[in-house]
């Protein structure tokens, strides 16, 4: 099957509690359990209502408790002893065998066995699912010989455990939770509240600890396993390690480099890192190795999860040298990571460089510190608190229970940098290439190939005229990728009858739901392409000789870089060239690849450090080995032979020219790449004046363009550094034979077989025959746009013409002509190789369900108003409403005038930009679709060119006319599966009647993700294929990201069925659907609903010219140009209804032939499809049988949606507030209410706002507000979607997403009276507050977290400090900050403005200056008064001491405020044009 049950992803809630001075108590344990219960909403509950996905505790070894246990049994425990917590097999014989092996290996280490203990448990509290997999749970007590130190024992326990695990590898139920003399772990598949009821030890008051880590898991699987509950042996992790495949690969490659005198037999423990299963456990493995090798927990975590140090100009040079030195020994383990860890002495919390997980801490007077995903997870009195804060991006907070100190990053880093003279070592030993920009002209390089030879090389490497003009020229001229529109409607490489280069067979993987893409445009400060080459050394040995490296800023080499590299004199950098061409008359491609591996191995053994793979030596009979094949095969060989870390793979190739090509080479092991033919080609374009720039500029532009493309590809997967991306193999090989994958691309996902070595050799031969014939011109191409005689396009002119003829005439016979062209086309998609086999029991068409029932299953795909003209957008809505289907608003909002009419879009999309998302928008929806990814460009945000942002479009999107709008790549409130569950909860609270849909894009593992989405209580999942359309997207995204929906749909169907969830969720497919045949095939493969994008647009008149992004659509469909819309748009709704009527008719005819009366009865009927043999040699090697496999349904459960998916949390406080306020809302009466609140009360205010928006609109109750006062800690999304007329006052603090999507009203948050801390130094609200807000006011007397005001489009706010990336993508509103800000302030800010207090005078350094400028407020009198008025209101609403201090010393503070505004804004107009700013313009009484 395509669905792999072993693939599991998880996210969670996590935390730690510790007594700072190390005093053990049962209170610490009890508080940790209480905290876990308060984060139950961050986990998942399975169908039996009692089984969780896993939770657990890691505590200091409870010495007093264990000594009592031993005494009761008559055991004598030595001064130094260990306790192992083991899961054993239920089978008594296997359990006995495991005990015997455990004892043998421990005794081999001269450790003496004290005894075994059955851990007291109460199975009655477990659910059926947990009970069915419950292992035997036992503890083993072990004494150390006299004189052993605890760390010595810990190291020998590590070696013993690894030997035990290797001997018991076949017993899948055996698992060592912990085997340590420092810490102990209790974990399992119960609910958090049941943990002490299951493990009776935890309820025993004698069990004490000064440290306790806790973890609540949310898995994408409904059959979770006991061992995967966390914590692991040292850490608990919330997030996902995006780089895990590369980290595991490098851990294996470095095995021979790990050496330490502390463990002479360390290699007995290899492999050190598990290569399958949980990413968190792999990181725990590596941390354990580093600690065993003598590293302390602080250096180990700074090595694994370093901050973003490369682009920090203010970093201390000594500290920079420390991180630089470390980077030479290990790549970052990168991805969303909130990590808590402990070795028994230290307890620590570490955050990833992007700050993608929340970590809030509270310190109380009794010396307890809690740090967790949320604040408010245990109940303390306000006057007990001495400090509140958060761990920020890249920060490490350490509690040293021995010295009784809390160490923040500044202190730990000060210690680390001073341990060795890193700066001196680096300056003395690291070589750096002379930058291309600094070289004299004669060293820049020039063309080496004459025109004829250049043409031959271009033809051999399959260049096309189209590629020269649309890809290479654009990169050289503009320094960035070309943008295109529409989707990819050409055949996959393996289906094509044209020769295609091997790069075309690889599809980029991308992050969705369980981890986010990151933002290479606005958050580039965390990203780096910096590359070091040389021999790697032993990470456990810090010495000057380990700093011999040669460093440069990008792995893409220019001529001068390559020359410098290959002419180094030192032995450290010895370079030798390996020719990767072969004589086709004497050998084969496959044999050559194997021979290259042999040669490479021999060269590295003989001392080669820079292994240069070159394909320059081609000739008539000499063909190039495709560079990725050579790189991948040699990488695997060198890793297997323990040689990879002594060599670097440099690729001198003609084959790489666009960013995807370089990403493939790097992803499979290349260290650096010299694309000589791309430079030769650009040189000719300069010589022929096709590019009117000098050679140096063009080469630099090209490399900058490739660098940007690499950043984008890495960021799609959430990866920040090239070191972590290298060897990560984050591609699916679609259409490669297993032999090719096995030899060259080991570890890449490949599911359907395909092209063999022989096929590639034949392609190379065919290209060679053409290459050396001077009269044969370079190919015209046709991959990007239709070219007569070139690559087949599914929307070729004939298809477009016949479809438009059919919808205009309304004649079914015309449609049949169109359908014949589509259904009998050359194999273009995988489904084209699956034929429908008519059944023997045909039925009368009158018995088939009517077209009106099918129409309910048809949606038009999301296309925004802005991308489409208003007329086209409304026509789609009218058409779908008239037949009972659904149109989708897309991500650009919708005109409220359309609500309640036949022009309303019944599906409202919520995308990452949140354009126009208000409570009224959401309540006027039957379906709310969360667009996690888009088929044409997964991992990227939407894009609307400035020419299309007219005043009308800007009004709908709450933005500035004429300014390009780019959505962030991630939803900033979805960094994990539990974040998605929270957004679904937010939406269900505001509009309980709407179905919540989640749009995913097909990729390997999408079934696993879809299972998690279903567990997050979505109602509908859309699986989009790579061939979906787009209004504007980089060309490499359109061509190389996303996979066929056939693979994604089948995997998702199999996953949902296998996990017993399919009957609870609807499954939709979209991407390239054109005819009734597509509907039938998609239904058989699992879909019960269908999305159409391009087809309806073509029906409206689109001619598929691919110029949507230029705003000059010739038919007025995809333009905002008044003249084009008025003179050329003829798209009436009847054309769209005709199209769907034709599809429904064809579908019903096919159903009748198949003997099926209801569409849902087709689902899973794969017997009605048969695999065709294929029409080309490559097609014939495809293995599509996995598409026809079905999962075994759970008894009594359907293969399609038959019931609802209600969440366990119904939002009781929300319901209470709405019930009490409803009569007053109906009567438009103001009323005040009071409530207590806790962190489990989430999305408070959403239900009330939804009801107000439904009855009175977004602002209809603003004059008669409902006021609610709360006391305590608010859960996530306090005040989400706040409508005008809702005023929320909170005394206490709040978690993430405060005021998200608020449209009006007021939120005011103040600390409790009598708080001991200063408000502006304490965190009061969490991350991503005011995300997508369009109005209203937020006042908070304290600090906010990361990404405050991201995509703020109109809210006015005052807070007292924020984290990194503040006001990112802001298009409107006013933000006032009375304290410190983090870095990257104002990135992508195109509207609104901000006031920032800059007491230390360094704020300007933390501003992203690309689009904004910083002015002094004291030079702007009206702004000074306006600011003063805002602060006065802040004080009135929150009683802010900070605000009072500033007002009382106004003359001093006024000079310290900066005003940040977009460069495109006129400072004089910032206040004047804002009618809703009138209140702030009052000059307040002083």
From Swiss-Prot:
Keywords: 3Fe-4S, Amino-acid biosynthesis, FAD, Flavoprotein, FMN, Glutamate biosynthesis, Glutamine amidotransferase, Iron, Iron-sulfur, Metal-binding, NADP, Oxidoreductase, Zymogen. Residues 1-11 form a propeptide. It catalyses: 2 L-glutamate + NADP(+) = L-glutamine + 2-oxoglutarate + NADPH + H(+). Residues 12-402 form the Glutamine amidotransferase type-2 domain. One of its GO terms (molecular function) is metal ion binding. Catalyzes the conversion of L-glutamine and 2-oxoglutarate into two molecules of L-glutamate. Optimum pH is 7.6. It comes from Escherichia coli (strain K12). Binds 1 [3Fe-4S] cluster. The active site is at residue 12. Belongs to the glutamate synthase family. Glutamine binds to the large subunit and transfers the amido group to 2-oxoglutarate that apparently binds to the small subunit. Pathway: Amino-acid biosynthesis; L-glutamate biosynthesis via GLT pathway; L-glutamate from 2-oxoglutarate and L-glutamine (NADP(+) route): step 1/1; Energy metabolism; nitrogen metabolism. Transmembrane segments: none annotated. GO terms for biological process: ammonia assimilation cycle; glutamate biosynthetic process; L-glutamate biosynthetic process. This is Glutamate synthase [NADPH] large chain. FMN binds at residues 1049-1101. The gene is gltB. GO terms for cellular component: cytosol; glutamate synthase complex (NADPH). [3Fe-4S] cluster binds at residues 1102, 1108, 1113.
């Amino acid at each position: 099957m395509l669905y792999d049950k072993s693939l599991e992803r998880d996210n969670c809630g996590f935390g730690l509690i510790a007594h700072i001075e190390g005093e053990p108590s049962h209170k610490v344990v009890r508080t940790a359990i209480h905290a876990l219960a308060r984060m139950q909403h961050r986990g998942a509950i399975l169908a039996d209502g009692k089984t969780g996905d896993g939770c657990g505790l890691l505590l200091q070894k409870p010495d007093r408790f264990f000594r009592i246990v031993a005494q009761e049994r008559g055991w004598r425990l030595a001064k130094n002893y260990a306790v192992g917590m083991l899961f054993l097999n239920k089978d008594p014989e296997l359990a006995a065998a495991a005990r015997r092996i455990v004892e043998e290996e421990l005794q081999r280490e001269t450790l003496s066995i004290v005894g075994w203990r059955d851990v007291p448990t109460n199975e009655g509290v477990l659910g059926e699912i947990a009970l069915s997999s419950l292992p035997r749970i036992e503890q083993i007590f072990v004494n150390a010989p006299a004189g052993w130190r605890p760390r010595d024992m810990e190291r020998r326990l590590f070696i013993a455990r690894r030997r035990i695990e290797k001997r018991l590898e076949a017993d899948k139920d055996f698992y060592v939770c912990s085997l340590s003399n420092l810490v102990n772990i209790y974990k399992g598949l119960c609910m958090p509240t049941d943990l002490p009821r299951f493990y009776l030890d935890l309820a025993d008051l004698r069990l004490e600890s000064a440290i306790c880590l806790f973890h609540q898991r949310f898995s994408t699987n409904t059959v979770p396993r006991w061992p995967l509950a966390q914590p692991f042996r040292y850490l608990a992790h919330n997030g996902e390690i995006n780089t895990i495949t590369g980290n595991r690969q490098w851990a294996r490659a470095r095995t021979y480099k790990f050496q330490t005198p502390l463990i002479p037999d360390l290699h007995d423990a290899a492999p050190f890192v598990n290569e399958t299963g949980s990413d968190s456990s792999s990181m725990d493995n590596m941390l354990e190795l580093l600690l065993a090798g003598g590293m302390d927990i602080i250096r180990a975590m700074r090595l694994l999860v370093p901050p973003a140090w490369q682009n920090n100009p203010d970093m201390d040079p000594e500290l920079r040298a420390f991180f630089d030195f470390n980077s030479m020994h290990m790549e970052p383990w990168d991805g969303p990571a909130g990590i808590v860890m402990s070795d028994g002495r230290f307890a620590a919390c570490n955050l990833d460089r992007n700050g993608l997980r929340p970590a809030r801490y509270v310190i109380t007077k009794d010396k307890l510190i809690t740090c967790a995903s949320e604040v408010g997870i245990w109940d303390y009195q306000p006057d007990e608190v001495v400090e509140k804060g958060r761990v920020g991006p890249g920060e490490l907070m350490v509690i040293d229970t021995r010295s009784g100190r809390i160490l923040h990053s500044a202190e730990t880093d000060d210690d680390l940098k001073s341990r060795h003279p890193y700066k001196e070592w680096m300056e003395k030993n690291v070589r750096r290439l002379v930058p291309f920009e600094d070289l004299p002209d004669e060293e820049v390089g020039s063309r080496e190939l004459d025109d004829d030879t250049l043409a031959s090389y271009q033809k051999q490497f399959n260049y096309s005229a189209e590629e020269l003009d649309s890809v290479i020229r654009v990169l050289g001229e503009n320094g960035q990728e070309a943008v295109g529109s529409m989707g990819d409607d050409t055949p996959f490489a393996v289906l094509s009858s044209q020769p295609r280069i091997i790069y075309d067979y690889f599809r980029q993987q991308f992050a969705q739901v369980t981890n986010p893409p990151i933002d290479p445009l606005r958050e580039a400060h965390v990203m780096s392409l910096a590359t070091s080459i040389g021999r790697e050394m032993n990470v456990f040995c810090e010495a000057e000789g380990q700093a011999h490296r040669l460093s440069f800023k990008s792995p893409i080499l220019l001529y001068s870089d390559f020359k410098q590299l290959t002419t180094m004199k030192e032995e450290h950098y010895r370079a030798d060239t390996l020719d990767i061409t072969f004589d086709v008359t004497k050998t084969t491609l496959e044999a050559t690849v194997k021979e290259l591996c042999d040669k490479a191995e021999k060269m590295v053994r003989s001392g080669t450090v820079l292994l240069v793979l070159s394909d320059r030596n081609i000739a008539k009979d000499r063909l190039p080995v495709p560079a990725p094949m050579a790189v991948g095969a040699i990488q695997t060989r060198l890793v297997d032979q323990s040689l990879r870390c002594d060599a670097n793979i440099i690729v001198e190739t003609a084959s790489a020219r666009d960013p995807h090509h370089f990403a493939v080479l790097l992803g499979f092991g290349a260290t650096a790449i010299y694309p000589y033919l791309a430079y030769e080609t650009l040189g000719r374009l300069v010589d022929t004046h096709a590019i009117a720039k000098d050679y140096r500029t063009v080469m630099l532009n090209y490399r900058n363009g490739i660098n940007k493309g690499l950043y984008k590809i890495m960021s799609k997967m959430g990866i920040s550094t090239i070191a972590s991306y290298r060897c990560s193999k984050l591609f699916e090989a679609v259409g490669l034979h297993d032999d090719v994958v096995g030899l060259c691309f080991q570890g890449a996902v490949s599911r359907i077989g395909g092209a063999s070595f022989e096929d590639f050799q034949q392609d190379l031969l065919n290209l060679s025959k053409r290459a050396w014939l001077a009269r044969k011109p370079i190919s015209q191409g046709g991959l990007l746009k239709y070219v007569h005689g070139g690559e087949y396009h599914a929307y070729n002119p004939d298809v477009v013409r016949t479809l438009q003829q059919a919808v205009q005439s309304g004649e079914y016979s015309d449609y049949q002509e169109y359908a014949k062209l589509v259904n009998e086309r050359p194999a273009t998609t995988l489904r084209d190789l699956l034929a429908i086999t008519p059944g023997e029991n045909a039925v009368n068409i009158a018995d088939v369900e009517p077209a009106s029932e099918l129409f309910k299953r048809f949606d038009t795909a999301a296309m925004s108003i802005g991308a489409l003209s208003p007329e086209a957008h409304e026509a789609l809505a009218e058409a779908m409403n008239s037949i009972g289907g659904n149109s989708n608003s897309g991500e650009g909002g919708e005109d409220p005038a359309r609500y309640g009419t036949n022009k309303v879009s019944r599906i409202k999309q919520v995308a990452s930009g949140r354009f126009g998302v208000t409570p009224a928008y959401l309540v006027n929806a039957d379906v709310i679709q969360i667009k996690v990814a888009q088929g044409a460009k997964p991992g990227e945000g939407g894009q609307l060119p400035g020419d299309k942002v007219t005043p009308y479009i800007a009004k709908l999107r709450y933005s500035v006319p004429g300014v390009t709008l780019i959505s962030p790549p991630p939803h900033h409130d979805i960094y994990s599966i539990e974040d998605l569950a929270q957004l679904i909860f937010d939406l269900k609270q505001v509009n309980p009647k709407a179905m919540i849909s989640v749009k995913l894009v097909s990729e390997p593992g999408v079934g696993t993700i879809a299972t998690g989405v279903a567990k997050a209580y979505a109602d509908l999942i859309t699986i989009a294929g790579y061939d979906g359309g787009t209004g504007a997207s980089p060309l490499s995204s359109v061509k190389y990201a996303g996979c066929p929906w056939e693979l994604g749909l089948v995997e998702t169907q199999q996953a949902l069925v296998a996990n017993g969830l399919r009957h609870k969720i609807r499954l939709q497919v979209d991407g390239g659907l054109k005819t009734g045949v597509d509907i039938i095939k998609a239904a058989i493969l699992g879909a019960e609903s269908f999305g159409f994008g391009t087809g309806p647009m073509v029906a409206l008149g689109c001619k598929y010219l691919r110029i949507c992004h230029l705003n000059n659509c010739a038919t007025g469909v995809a333009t905002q140009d008044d003249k084009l819309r008025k003179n050329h748009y003829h798209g009436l709704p009847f054309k769209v209804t005709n199209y769907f009527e034709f599809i429904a008719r064809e579908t019903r005819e096919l159903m009748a032939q198949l003997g099926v009366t209801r569409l849902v009865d087709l689902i899973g009927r794969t017997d009605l499809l048969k695999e065709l043999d294929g029409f080309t040699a490559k097609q014939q090697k495809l293995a599509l049988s996995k598409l026809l496999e079905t999962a075994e349904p759970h008894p009594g459960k359907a293969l399609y949606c038959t019931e609802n998916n209600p969440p366990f949390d119904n939002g009781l406080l929300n319901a209470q507030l709405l019930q009490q306020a409803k009569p007053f809302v109906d009567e438009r009466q103001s009323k005040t209410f009071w409530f207590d609140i806790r962190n489990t009360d989430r999305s408070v205010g959403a239900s009330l706002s939804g009801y107000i928006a439904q009855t009175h609109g977004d602002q209809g109750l603003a004059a008669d507000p409902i006021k609610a006062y709360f006391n305590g800690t608010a859960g996530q999304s306090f005040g989400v979607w706040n409508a005008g007329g809702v005023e929320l006052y909170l005394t206490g603090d709040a978690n993430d997403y405060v005021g998200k999507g608020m449209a009006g009203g007021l939120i005011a948050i103040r600390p409790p009276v009598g708080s001991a801390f200063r408000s502006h130094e304490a965190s009061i609200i969490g991350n991503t507050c005011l995300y997508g807000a369009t109005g209203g006011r937020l006042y908070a007397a304290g600090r906010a977290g990361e990404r405050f005001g991201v995509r703020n489009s109109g809210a006015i706010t005052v807070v007292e400090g924020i984290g990194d990336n503040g006001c990112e993508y802001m298009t409107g509103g006013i933000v006032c900050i009375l304290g410190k800000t983090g870095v990257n302030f104002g990135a992508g800010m195109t509207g609104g403005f901000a006031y920032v207090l800059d007491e230390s005078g360094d704020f300007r350094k933390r501003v992203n200056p690309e689009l904004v400028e910083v002015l002094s407020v004291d030079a702007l009198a009206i702004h000074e008064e306006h600011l003063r008025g805002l602060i006065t209101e802040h004080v009135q609403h929150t009683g802010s001491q900070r605000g009072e201090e500033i007002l009382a010393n106004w003359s001093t503070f006024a000079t310290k405020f900066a005003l940040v505004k977009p460069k495109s804004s006129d400072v004089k107009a910032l206040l004047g044009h804002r009618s809703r700013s009138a209140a702030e313009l009052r000059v307040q009484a002083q």
